[in-house]
Amino acid sequence: METIYTLNADKFLLLLLSGFMIGLSKTGIPGLGLLSATLAAIVLPARVSTGIVLIMLICGDIFAVIYYRRNAVWRYLFRLFPFAFTGIFIGYLLMKKINDEQLRPLIGIIILIMLCLNYLWKKKSNLNIPHRWYFAAILGLIAGITTMMANAAGPIMIIYLLAMNLDKKEFVGTGAWYFFIGNLFKVPFSAKLGLINPDTLQLNLLLLPGIICGAITGILILKKISTRVFNIVVEVLTVMAAIKLII
């Protein structure tokens, strides 16, 4: 397993970049989340990368829930959590059976599927999305499984939140609290799998400045950049990185 003692400078810088992108994704540029998870899976063994990314995500989540702490619509979260937690447990059981060679391409495939979903819902945003309980059940289960195995539930949550017809701040705030609580719920399962341990936490500590810089940068530059162009670039890079994982 890679540790802070065996990582070369290039790999460490790529992980620092991954942390920076996670910070950015939590304060206004969500598309970077998938790219950061994919990049970490390229740099590190696939299983280990999920634990490293999880702690980075939680650090980023803290910034998001502080910034949007009053904007969550809790009734939608309470509807989703039982199914999401069940999905996380299913993902944990699957992770017990999968090795690095199997998980690496699987992460790539999950990322590509999530990107396709994201693209379809952007193109068909006027579709009538169901509000019934089974909608939360299905998306909650899928989000739980994908987040446990690949830290890649973002597009699923976007679909769910779109269906709730929230305003912009409620949309971001509700999503921020979902990911914070969901990611905390994943910690004991990841620790049980050996994906979070003293070595990974030490590495996470060194990556913390990148996350902080990303979160602050996201707040400062969000209104000054073309989000559409930026997201296109991010999605292209994510596709390339996901394909690299698969092949």
Q: What does each model-identified segment do?
A:
Residues I216-L237:
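Interfacial loop-to-transmembrane junctions
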